[in-house]
């Protein structure tokens, strides 16, 4: 009959599971479950994860944990396996706590609405009653429940399981233990052999990787089991160090030893009395159970959370404000002392330092805070009970904003705790009640708040001395009341007398517009396009203001001496031509400096170029165009071509340079040829010098690269030579391998023949020996044991 495994866990099974986990670890659940006859590997693992793991927190849930649980349930609905490690609990604990919070909220709402009924007999069953198991039902999740106490009389199966577990867990000298020890020694020798082999291969230049971890298992030599890495970041340990120092100073080793001794004596005395009273019971079992109980208490004490530090709200009255209040009080006292006994001035000063002693001062009530947990539960219930979105209608109203945990991140939104500051708005606390209201505001009221005394009734009170409300609705009502009061007082003024007044007629003024026209906000894309168009037009206008040389991208001077250029322009005698030359020199210098070409050498300080208006530039261009359209341009062009041709014919080397004999004598021709030769020679020398300079410059810049190229070329040659040598060696060794393989077969055949010959001779010798032995035995038998007369 198959055995159905599962059910409630007992205390014995828990202890066996703990011992098995301590021996086999957290990765061999099949071996662990072999010690428990009624549990499967999955159930053993679930029991450890859900209940027996020392890292599980079983203390009461705090308010922060409830708030975080509801916030994460809102962000990740039904993902309890993901929520559990964030909250610090198990998935089952999170689910049960979540359901309990919803049930408590529902019960609270029913009590508020009066749905509880007249008595418990008429009320509906609670959530705990619904979830409580009825007789005959099985717990669907027994791994997360406390263990059942052990019975006095154990079943035969339980006794057999317990004895087998004791034998297997306590066996360290039996056959299996010895076999395990031999296996460990073999494994160690195998590991050392692998290390030796790896060391030899490494010395030979071959690196291999040792993989000792089996697939699906943990390498306990390389990894750390049960490791819980700390969160990254730096933490301030000043407070912890100070607390440790205080505890170390308060610790007295003598008192501690005395207390431990007394405690040990008391425990031993109680244990002795217990053993004496219970003689029939198994003392060893009770001692083990007692030790297990003590260890459980120690573990629970370690799991309990530390006492949290006191978190005080930030004060609203800062040090500077406190100093200002003190200075104000000192200034009032100083003014009172300066007045002295003058009654006229003394009546204008009030004493604001003295407080009314007979009135008890209450602590101002802090503003009410939103209950995030209750709001989140209401939101969850509203979303659960809402109708389908297919039916239409309005959305479910939820608590958003500051009244909920929000969706800012994985952690819920925190409320900023502040203390009320009555000094910030004196006499205007909407949540305060006057202890001794004075009707009509005739004098200062003795309020429980720390408000200054109002001797001159500057702060008027409303409704019998109650402080003025600070809500928007009350402020609006107060303003409307003040307006009505002013209108009533103005209406109560006497009517004006009937008197005619003659006023001078004032000049008419243009009517002001009734209100400023509101323009719609301009789109950012339209604004960017408009600004881009404006910048483009400004750039085009600036481009047109430049010279034609820059506009047409004509070459500009590379080597220029501005001072020499300006001096040459100033030497022109004709005033009109001089002005033109100066302006041209300024334009050339400005273009050379402002739009310099790469590698240009400009000497001298550039002169400031006067910026002309666009109107004048257009007029000048129109005048030049009109002048160019006339016949003078053609005449000037012809004259320029003629002079250019004549100048080029006289300077260019060629046949055109040499005139006829009747026009020029031989001496002048010789001198011209000599001059041309000198010019060509000078040009060649200059070109050679420039080439040498350029060669030096290139050698300076690229000398390192050339050396590097030479070195790499040499290395490549060496590598090629080594490669060729290696190829030759490889071919030689391959030839040797082929010849060796052929020779090996021949040698093996020869050795086999020799072995066969030796074996054949050995068989023949054995056969001959056997024959001789038989002959000797027959001879001895025939002679009766006498050979040569001897027995």
From Swiss-Prot:
Residues 128-151, 240-255 have a biased composition (Basic and acidic residues). InterPro entries: CDC5L/Cef1, Cdc5p/Cef1_C, Homeodomain-like_sf, Myb_dom, SANT/Myb, SANT_CDC5L_II. Transmembrane segments: none annotated. Residues 523-551, 705-779 form a coiled coil. SUPFAM superfamilies: Homeodomain-like. The keyword Repeat applies. It is found in: Cytoplasm; Nucleus. The keyword Nucleus applies. This is Pre-mRNA-splicing factor cef1. It comes from Emericella nidulans (strain FGSC A4 / ATCC 38163 / CBS 112.46 / NRRL 194 / M139) (Aspergillus nidulans). The gene is cef1.
């Amino acid at each position: 009959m198959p055995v159905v495994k599962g059910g409630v866990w007992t205390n014995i099974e828990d202890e066996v599971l703990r011992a098995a986990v301590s021996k086999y670890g957290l990765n061999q659940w099949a071996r662990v479950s072999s010690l428990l006859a009624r549990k499967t590997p999955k159930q053993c693992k679930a029991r450890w994860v859900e209940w027996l793991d020392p890292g599980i927190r079983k203390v009461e849930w705090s308010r922060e944990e409830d708030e975080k649980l509801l916030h994460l349930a809102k962000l990740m609905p039904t993902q309890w396996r993901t929520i559990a490690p964030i909250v610090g609990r198990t998935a089952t604990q999170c689910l049960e706590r979540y359901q309990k919070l919803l049930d408590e909220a529902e019960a609270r709402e029913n009590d508020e609405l009066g749905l509880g009924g007249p008595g418990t007999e008429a009320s509906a069953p609670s959530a705990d009653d619904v979830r409580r198991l009825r007789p005959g039902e099985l717990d669907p999740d027994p791994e997360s429940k406390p263990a059942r106490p052990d019975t006095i009389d154990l079943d035969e199966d339980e006794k057999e399981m317990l004895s087998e577990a004791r034998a297997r867990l306590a066996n360290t000298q039996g056959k299996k233990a010895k076999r395990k020890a031999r296996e460990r020694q073999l494994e160690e020798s195998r590991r050392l052999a692998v290390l030796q082999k790896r060391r030899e291969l490494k010395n030979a230049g071959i690196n291999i990787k040792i993989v000792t971890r089996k697939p699906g298992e943990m390498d306990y030599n390389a990894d750390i089991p049960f490791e819980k890495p700390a969160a990254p970041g730096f933490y301030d340990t000043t407070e912890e160090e100070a607390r440790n120092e205080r505890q170390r100073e308060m610790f007295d080793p003598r008192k501690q030893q005395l207390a431990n001794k007394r405690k040990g004596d008391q425990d031993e005395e109680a244990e002795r009395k217990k053993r004496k009273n219970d003689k029939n019971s198994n003392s060893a079992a009770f001692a083990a159970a007692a030790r297990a109980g003590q260890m459980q208490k120690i573990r629970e004490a370690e799991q309990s959370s530390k006492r949290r530090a006191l978190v005080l709200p930030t004060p609203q009255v800062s040090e500077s404000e406190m100093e200002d209040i003190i200075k104000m009080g000192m200034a009032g006292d100083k003014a009172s002392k300066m007045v002295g006994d003058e009654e006229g001035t003394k009546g204008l000063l009030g004493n604001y330092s003295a407080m009314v002693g007979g009135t008890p001062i209450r602590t101002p009530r802090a503003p009410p805070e939103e209950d995030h947990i209750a709001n989140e539960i209401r939101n969850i219930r509203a979303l659960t009970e809402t109708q389908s979105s297919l039916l239409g209608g309005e959305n479910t109203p939820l608590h958003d904003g500051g009244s909920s945990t929000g969706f800012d991140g994985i952690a819920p939104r925190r409320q900023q705790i502040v203390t009320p500051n009555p000094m910030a708005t004196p006499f205007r606390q909407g949540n305060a009640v006057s202890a001794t209201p004075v009707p009509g505001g005739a004098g200062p009221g003795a309020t429980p708040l720390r408000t200054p005394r109002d001797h001159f009734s500057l702060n008027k009170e409303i409704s019998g001395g109650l402080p003025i409300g600070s809500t928007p609705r009350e402020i609006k009502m107060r303003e409307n009341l003040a307006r009505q009061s002013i209108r009533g007082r103005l209406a109560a003024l006497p009517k004006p007398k009937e008197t005619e007044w003659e006023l001078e007629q004032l000049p008419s003024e243009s009517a002001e517009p009734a209100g400023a026209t509101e323009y719609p906000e301009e789109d950012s894309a339209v604004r960017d396009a408009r600004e881009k168009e404006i910048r483009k037009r400004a750039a085009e206008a600036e481009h047109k203001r430049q010279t034609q040389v820059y506009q047409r991208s004509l070459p500009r001077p590379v080597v220029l001496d501005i001072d020499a250029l300006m001096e040459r322009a100033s030497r022109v005698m004709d005033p009109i031509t001089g002005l033109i030359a100066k302006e041209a020199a300024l334009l050339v210098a400005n273009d050379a400096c402002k739009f310099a070409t790469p590698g240009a050498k400009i000497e001298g300080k550039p002169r400031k170029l006067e910026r002309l208006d666009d109107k004048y530039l257009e007029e000048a261009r129109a005048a030049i165009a009109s002048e160019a359209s006339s016949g003078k341009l053609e005449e000037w062009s012809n004259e320029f071509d003629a002079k250019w041709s004549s100048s080029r014919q006289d300077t260019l080397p060629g046949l055109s340079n040499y005139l006829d004999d009747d026009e020029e004598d031989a001496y002048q021709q010789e001198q011209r040829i000599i001059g041309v030769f000198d010019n060509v020679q000078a040009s060649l020398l200059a070109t050679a010098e420039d080439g040498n300079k350029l060669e030096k410059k290139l050698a300076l810049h690229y000398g390192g690269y050339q050396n590097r190229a030479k070195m790499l070329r040499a290395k490549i040659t060496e590598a090629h030579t080594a490669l060729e040598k290696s190829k030759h060696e490889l071919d030689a060794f391959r030839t040797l391998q082929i010849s060796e393989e052929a020779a090996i077969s021949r040698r093996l055949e020869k050795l086999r023949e020799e072995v066969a010959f030796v074996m054949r001779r050995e068989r023949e010798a054995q056969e001959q020996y056997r024959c001789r032995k038989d002959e000797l035995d027959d001879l001895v038998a025939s002679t009766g044991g006498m050979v040569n007369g001897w027995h």
